[in-house]
Curated annotation (Swiss-Prot):
Name assigned to this protein: 26S proteasome regulatory subunit RPN8
PANTHER family recorded: 26S PROTEASOME NON-ATPASE REGULATORY SUBUNIT 7 (PTHR10540:SF7), EUKARYOTIC TRANSLATION INITIATION FACTOR 3 SUBUNIT F-RELATED (PTHR10540)
Family the UniProt entry places it in: Belongs to the peptidase M67A family.
Keyword line: Proteasome
Keyword Cytoplasm: no
Pfam families, per database record: JAB (PF01398), MitMem_reg (PF13012)
Function: Acts as a regulatory subunit of the 26S proteasome which is involved in the ATP-dependent degradation of ubiquitinated proteins.
SMART domains in alphabetical order: JAB_MPN (SM00232)
Region (Disordered) location: 299-326
Source taxon at top rank: Eukaryota
C-alpha cells in the first residue's frame, strides 16, 4: 500500500513553535515534546501551517506506557477552528530525533481526530549536521513478499520549508540579525557549497549503512527503496572509455574509466580557463581603448583653450581690412 501524497510543506511558524515548546518544557532528562499539526491535506501536497503543544508523558523504560490528554486535544482543536476554519487537524509532531517504538500506537490514536491518514512530523531541535531538520512519515499497511500477514509501518515523505509572503519577511528579518555581516558574498557561497557537500556525504553514508544491513540480513529488502537507488545510479554519467576495446581485467577497466574522467575534467577546466583568459583580455582592450579616447579628448580640450586668441586677432584684422577698403 502506498500513500497519495507527494510532499509535505512545513511553514517556518511551525518550526519556531516546536522549538519554543521544547525550550519551555526542557528538563534534565531531555524528554521529547509532542504536539498537534494543523493545515490542509486535501491535495497531493500536505501543507502544515500551524500547530499547538500537548501535555505528554511517557515511561522511558517501558515505551508502551504513555499519556495524552484527549480533552485538551478536543478543546484546543475547537478553539483553533474558531480562529481559522480552513485549518484542520492533519497529524502530530514530536522532537525526535528519531522514530520510537510507541509512535505507531500514538499515530493510531491521532487517526481518530484526522480525516484520513495521520501525518507524523519529526523535528530535530538539536540538529548538528546540515539539511532540513524535519522528517515526515505516514503509516501504511506493508504487504510482505512471503505472503504472511500485513503489518503497519511508516513510509517516509519528502519535506520542504514553504512560507507565505508575510512569513518570508519575518524570517528574512530574523536571518539578517543572525547572519554575519562581515562575511562577503563569496564566503557565503563557499560556505553554502561546503554545507551541501557535507549533506551529500551524510546521505551517502546512510545509503551505504542501509545496504550493508540489508546485505547482512539485519533489515529486510525494500524493493521501493532499492528501485529508487537504482534510478539514482542510472543517472550517474558513464565514465567508461567507449573508444577502447574491452579491458582484460577489472583493474584495467577501472584505470580506463579513471583516465576518461581525468581527461573530461581537464578539458572542462581548460575551457573554463580559456573563457576567463578571453574575458580578461577583452577587459584590458576595452580599458586601453578608453584610455586612448581619454587622451584624445584631453588633447583637443588643451588645443581649444589655445586657439580662441588667434581667432579673435584674425577677426580684428578682417574688420580693419574691410574699413580700409571702404
Amino acid at each position: 500500500m502506498s500513500v497519495n501524497y507527494e510532499q509535505v510543506n512545513v511553514a517556518p511558524l511551525v518550526l519556531l513553535s516546536v522549538l519554543d515548546h521544547y525550550k519551555r518544557m526542557n528538563t534534565p532528562d531531555n524528554k521529547r515534546c509532542v504536539g498537534v499539526l494543523l493545515g490542509d491535506n486535501s491535495g497531493s501536497t500536505i501543507k502544515v501551517t500551524n500547530s499547538f503543544a500537548l501535555p505528554f508523558e511517557e515511561d522511558e523504560k517501558n515505551p508502551d506506557v504513555w499519556f495524552l490528554d484527549h480533552n485538551y486535544i478536543e478543546n484546543m482543536n475547537d478553539m483553533c477552528k474558531k480562529i481559522n476554519a480552513k485549518e484542520k487537524m492533519i497529524g502530530w509532531y514530536h522532537s525526535g530525533p528519531k522514530l520510537r517504538s510507541s509512535d505507531l500506537k500514538i499515530n493510531g490514536l491521532f487517526k481518530k481526530y484526522t480525516q484520513g491518514n495521520s501525518l507524523l512530523l519529526i523535528v530535530d531541535v538539536k540538529q548538528q549536521g546540515v539539511g532540513l531538520p524535519t522528517d515526515a512519515y505516514m503509516a501504511i499497511e506493508e504487504v510482505k513478499d512471503d505472503g504472511s500477514s500485513t503489518e503497519r509501518t511508516f513510509v517516509h515523505l519528502p519535506t520542504a520549508i514553504e512560507a507565505e509572503e508575510a512569513e518570508e519577511i519575518g524570517v528574512e528579518h530574523l536571518l539578517r540579525d543572525v547572519r554575519d555581516q562581515a562575511a562577503g558574498n563569496l564566503s557565503l557561497r563557499l560556505t553554502n557549497q561546503l554545507k551541501s557537500l557535507q549533506g551529500l556525504q551524510r546521505k551517502l553514508r546512510d545509503i551505504v549503512a542501509y545496504l550493508d544491513k540489508v546485505n547482512s540480513g539485519q533489515l529486510p529488502a525494500n524493493h521501493i527503496i532499492l528501485g529508487k537507488l537504482q534510478d539514482v545510479f542510472n543517472l550517474l554519467p558513464n565514465l567508461g572509455s567507449p573508444d577502447e576495446e574491452a579491458p582484460a581485467t577489472k583493474k584495467d577497466d577501472v584505470l580506463a574509466s579513471s583516465n576518461t574522467l581525468q581527461k573530461a575534467l581537464t578539458v572542462k577546466t581548460n575551457d573554463e580557463l580559456m573563457v576567463i583568459y578571453i574575458s580578461n583580455l577583452m577587459r584590458a582592450i576595452i580599458a586601453f581603448d578608453n584610455l586612448i579616447e581619454n587622451k584624445i579628448k584631453n588633447k583637443k580640450l588643451q588645443e581649444a583653450k589655445r586657439d580662441p586668441e588667434p581667432e579673435e586677432a584674425t577677426k580684428e584684422e578682417i574688420q580693419q581690412q574691410e574699413s580700409a577698403k571702404a
